[in-house]
Amino acid sequence: MINRDNKKAITKKGMISNRLNKFSIRKYTVGTASILVGTTLIFGLGNQEAKAAENTSTENAKQDDATTSDNKEVVSETENNSTTENDSTNPIKKETNTDSQPEAKEESTTSSTQQQQNNVTATTETKPQNIEKENVKPSTDKTATEDTSVILEEKKAPNYTNNDVTTKPSTSEIQTKPTTPQESTNIENSQPQPTPSKVDNQVTDATNPKEPVNVSKEELKNNPEKLKELVRNDNNTDRSTKPVATAPTSVAPKRLNAKMRFAVAQPAAVASNNVNDLITVTKQTIKVGDGKDNVAAAHDGKDIEYDTEFTIDNKVKKGDTMTINYDKNVIPSDLTDKNDPIDITDPSGEVIAKGTFDKATKQITYTFTDYVDKYEDIKARLTLYSYIDKQAVPNETSLNLTFATAGKETSQNVSVDYQDPMVHGDSNIQSIFTKLDENKQTIEQQIYVNPLKKTATNTKVDIAGSQVDDYGNIKLGNGSTIIDQNTEIKVYKVNPNQQLPQSNRIYDFSQYEDVTSQFDNKKSFSNNVATLDFGDINSAYIIKVVSKYTPTSDGELDIAQGTSMRTTDKYGYYNYAGYSNFIVTSNDTGGGDGTVKPEEKLYKIGDYVWEDVDKDGVQGTDSKEKPMANVLVTLTYPDGTTKSVRTDANGHYEFGGLKDGETYTVKFETPAGYLPTKVNGTTDGEKDSNGSSITVKINGKDDMSLDTGFYKEPKYNLGDYVWEDTNKDGIQDANEPGIKDVKVTLKDSTGKVIGTTTTDASGKYKFTDLDNGNYTVEFETPAGYTPTVKNTTAEDKDSNGLTTTGVIKDADNMTLDSGFYKTPKYSLGDYVWYDSNKDGKQDSTEKGIKDVKVTLLNEKGEVIGTTKTDENGKYRFDNLDSGKYKVIFEKPAGLTQTVTNTTEDDKDADGGEVDVTITDHDDFILDNGYFEEDTSDSDSDSDSDSDSDSDSDSDSDSDSDSDSDSDSDSDSDSDSDSDSDSDSDSDSDSDSDSDSDSDSDSDSDSDSDSDSDSDSDSDSDSDSDSDSDSDSDSDSDSDSDSDSDSDSDSDSDSDSDSDSDSDSDSDSDSDSDSDSDSDSDAGKHTPVKPMSTTKDHHNKAKALPETGSENNGSNNATLFGGLFAALGSLLLFGRRKKQNK
C-alpha cells in the first residue's frame, strides 16, 4: 500500500518542498529458512503467502536449527519531499510574496524489493522524453509529504517435526561492532566463497537434528523473556560450534539471503529433463498495481503481479524441470540483487519443486522433488511480483508485457510512468535509492540536481544521514545513514546536449563528465550532513552517494537519507526543494509484548479402503474382506488446489498439515472392476463406508475415520455359434455343421477392441469376464464362404450377420450367431479356330488352332491364369468366383485376326481382348478366329480403253524430202488418245487416204473377292529403246492396202535408215484382242492396284502416286512404244509397197 503525506509549513527562510518515497522489503523466518518476499508462491487460490519448508537446509552451517521467532521484517525506503515557502526573518532588501511555481506531480517514488520475483520477457517501445519539461503543480494549493510503504504479508510454513521450541542464547549480536558489521552468512557477498562441495556439506550439516532443550511449552508461555534468551543462546551456539562460510561478525538480516541457498542446495545427482509439455496451464493473469489503469508508476513502487495456475501431469518424476519466464522489461527486485525464487510448496508446506533464476534470460527453472513421485493430480498456483527494469526502460513508454508458464504465454499492455522533479523557484531536484548491499551494509542513492537545467544562483545541495524536516533541518529518528568523510560522493556534470533518463537511475556514469574533484574545496561535513556548493549553475548534475548504515541490535534495517537543494531568487529569498528516502524494517510478532507467535497446530485425516465382499457397507462382517491397495485418494484444499495419494498395502491413506476450522474434500477413485459399496451401512463411524466423496471440517482434532468400501463388479459371458448354412435359408438346421477357426472380434460401446477369438471345432465361441453394457461382435467371413441371410427366425436360431450388437444386463448373452455357405466356383473359356473363309463365323469345316496362349486377368488387372488351346483349339479356366474378368488371346504368328461379333455369341469371334462378367454361372462363349493372309497373282494381257496423256520428247534425225501424193481413206475407230510430241523436219506434201479399221476387242474377266475398296490403276510399263535415223527422199504415189494386226504388247527396237521415194496408200486394219483374267482375293482392307503386265513380268503392285509425279516414266514408255510401233509399221508398209511394185 502506498501512503503519501504532503505537508506545508511556513518558515522564516521560505517555502520548502519535501517529498517522501518509501521502499519496502518484507522478510520472514520460518524454521531455519529465511525468505525474502518478492516472489510469492501460492499453492491455492486467494492465499498470497510464501511458504518455506520447515527444517530446510537453506541457512548455512551456523544456522541449522529452527528458531521460534516468526520474524516478518518490513524494509521500507521512503523519500520525504516537501516544499515550504516562508518569509525569511533575516534582513532582506525587500519583502515580497512570490508566486509559487508549479510543483511536480505528487506521486512518491517507490523502488523496492517488496517482493521477490522471477522474470519473463516483453517488448519495450520507449518514447523519447525530455526531463527538462517542467511538469509541476502550484505549491500554494497544498504541500504534501507522502509516506509510501508497501507491506505484503506472508506466513511461515508450519514445522511438523518439532513442536517444542529449541533455542539458545545469542551473544554474537552484542559482541559485534554495529558500525562495521558484515554478513557472515551471505553466499552472494564479495568475500571468497566456499567451493560447492563445502556449501553442500554445510547445508547437510545444517539438516542434522540438534539436542533438544528441556524447556516446556508452559514455561515458555509464562516467561517470554526465557524464550528470547533461548533464541539468542541458540544463535550463539550455532556461531561458536558450526563451520561457517565467513567470520560471524554481522547481525545483518539473514533472511534476505536464505532464498539463494535454496538454489545452492539442489541435489546435483538428479538428472534434469524439461517437462513443459506435461504442464497444463489453466489460468494466467497480469495485473499492474491495483489493476485499475494498467499504469506502472515505477517510482511509486507499483508492482506487476503475475498469477499462474497449472496442473502437473502424473508422468512427471523427481528431477524433471519446468520453466517460468518473466518479461524482459521487468526484474524481481529493483533495490537488491536477491532474485532467487521461492520454492513451490503445497498448503501443508511440503516442497514440490525448487527454483533457480537466470538473470540473463530472466527465467526460473524449477526442479521437482520426490513430491511428484508420492502424489498425483497435483494442482499449483504461483504468484510472482516484479518491477519495471529501469535499465531496460529508461523513459516513460508503453509496453506489452509477456509472461509464460511452461512455454504458454500471456500478455498485458501497460504504460510506464516515472516521477517528475520537485520544483520551487529555480530549485529542482529528485532522488531515489538505487541499490542496497546488505553484505557491505551500504546504500546507494542517486540524485538529480537541476534536471530542468534552470539558471540557478547560490546553489547548495545538502546530503543528510537522516530525514530532513520541513525547515531543512536534520530530523533525528526514523532511520539514518552515516555521512562523513568516508562517504563516497561522486558528482557528474550533464552536458547541454545530454538528456537524463526519466528513470532517475544511471547505470553507466562514464558518459557524463566526472567533476568530483572540483568539489574537493566546495564540500563540507558537519553533524552527519555533507554540503556541496555548486554556486551559480545552468547545467544538470548527478550525485551518486554510497553511504554506510548500521543495522539495529536485532539485525533489522532502519535506513534514512535526505537531500535538499536551495537557491536564491532575484529578491534574495531562498527556495528549497528536497527528497528524503528511507528503508525501515520491523518485526511482526504474535503479540504486542514481543513474544513469539505460537506455532499453529496442524491436523491430519485419513483411514482405510477395503473390499466389501458381502456388499453390506460394514467392515469386518465377512472373513473374505481385505484391504485394497493402490486406490487413488485426492484431497482438495479450501482454495481449490489438490494433491493425491494411493492407499498402501494395508489399504491405509493419510493427509497431514491441515488447519483447524477449515473444510476439505476427500475423493476416492473407483478401482477398475469394482463398484462402491453401500454408504453408511452402520451407525458406527469407524466401521461404515463414507462413499466416494467425503467433505470434512477440522474441529481441533485429527479425523481418521474416513473409510470407503468397494465390491467386485459381477462378470458375464457373450457368444454362441458360427455354422455352415448348406441350404442358405439363414436358419440353424440340425444337420448343418459348425465352422471352425472363424475369427470373431469384440468391441466395447466406444468401438475399442477388447477381445478376439476363433471358433472351435464345433463352431462355438465365447467372450468372458464382461461387465454390463453394450458390445459389438464382428465375424470375419471364412475363405471360400459367403454370409447367409440374416434375422430370418428366432434370435437363438438365426444368423445375426457379419456385425451385430449384444447387450449384457446382469446376465450372459449367448445368442450372437452367424451363418455362411460355401461359395460356388465357375469356369470360363471356349474355342480358337482357323477362319478359312474369313467370315468371322465358326463353320463346321473350319478347324481349331492349337497352342494359342490365353491370359485371364481379374478386375484389378492382375494376371490370375494363363493357358494354351489344345489340339482342338479349346481352352478353359476353372475355380472362378463371380466377378469381372478380362480374357486376352495372343495372336498366332503369321495369322490375322478375323472379323468380330458377326453372329451369335457362341459362333462368332470376340476379338483379341474380351471383358466378361461371371454372375453365378459358367461362361463358355469366349471365342476368337484367325486366318492366313493370301497373295494375289494376276496375268492380264489387255488392251483396254485407255485415255493416255503422255509427253514424249523424241529426238529423231529425220531428213526426209518426200513428195507424196497420197489419197488415203482412213476409217479409224479407235479409243486411243495419244499425244505425241515429235520434232520432225520433213518436207512432205502428202495427200493420203488412209482407211484404217481398228477393232479392239477386249475381254476382261476379273473375279475379285475382297472386303476392301479396290483402286484399279492401269499402269503400263514399257521399255522401248528406239534410235531411228531416217534419211528419206521419196517421191511416191502409192495406193496401198495395209492390213495390220498388231498386239499392243510390243517391245520393239528399231534402227532404220531409209531412203525412199514412195507414194503409198496405206490401209491399216488393226485388231487388238486382249483377254485378261484377273482373280484377286484380299482379306484385309488393303488397296489392291491392278498391274500392267510387261515384258519383264515383275508383276509388282505399285500405288498411284499422290501427286502424279510418277506418271512421267509410264507415259514416256507408252509414247516411245507407240512411236516404235508406228515406225515399224511404216517400215513394214514400205517393204510391202516395194514388194507390190
UniProtKB/Swiss-Prot annotation:
Keyword Phosphoprotein assigned: no
Biased composition (Low complexity): 77-90, 109-126
Motif (YSIRK-G/S signaling motif): 23-34
Residue ranges annotated for the CNA-B domain, each copy included: 602-714, 715-824, 825-935
GO annotation (BP), single: cell adhesion
Compartment(s): Secreted, Cell wall
Biased composition (Acidic residues): 930-1080
Alphabetically ordered keywords of this record: Calcium, Cell wall, Peptidoglycan-anchor, Repeat, Secreted, Signal, Virulence
PANTHER family: TOL-PAL SYSTEM PROTEIN TOLA (PTHR34403:SF8)
Protein name (database record): Serine-aspartate repeat-containing protein E
Gene name of this polypeptide: sdrE
